[in-house]
Amino acid sequence: MVKNTLISVISEEEKRGSVEFQVFRFTNKIRRLTSHLELHKKDYLSQRGLRKILGKRQRLLAYLAKKNRVRYKELIGLLSIRETKTR
């Protein structure tokens, strides 16, 4: 499973403040909230929280893409995230 391999890599490095780890945690929260919202369609507070987390992850991914394009490509490949649109 992708999640376990990424956790083992990040745990070995013990860099919990790294951009990759933060994006990984936000992605897990997003997936958990998405499955919650499929059951509870009118939970507007959770929808707001999901939008906030999506924005935070998008900003972190933009930062990573600007600083290190190779690490960005690897991360979106591992987490199965679509590449962000450029304006």
Swiss-Prot record:
UniProt GO MF annotations: structural constituent of ribosome
Alphabetical UniProt keywords: Chloroplast, Plastid, Ribonucleoprotein, Ribosomal protein
Principal place of residence: plastid
Organism: Coffea arabica (Arabian coffee)
Gene3D superfamilies reported for this sequence: S15/NS1, RNA-binding
Name listed for the protein in its UniProt record: Small ribosomal subunit protein uS15c
Keyword Repressor in annotation: no
GO terms under biological process: translation
Location within or outside the cell: Plastid, Chloroplast
A GO CC term assigned to this protein in UniProt: chloroplast
Name of the encoding gene: rps15
Pfam families (alphabetical): Ribosomal_S15
SUBUNIT field: Part of the 30S ribosomal subunit.
Family that this chain belongs to: Belongs to the universal ribosomal protein uS15 family.
Top-level taxonomic group: Eukaryota
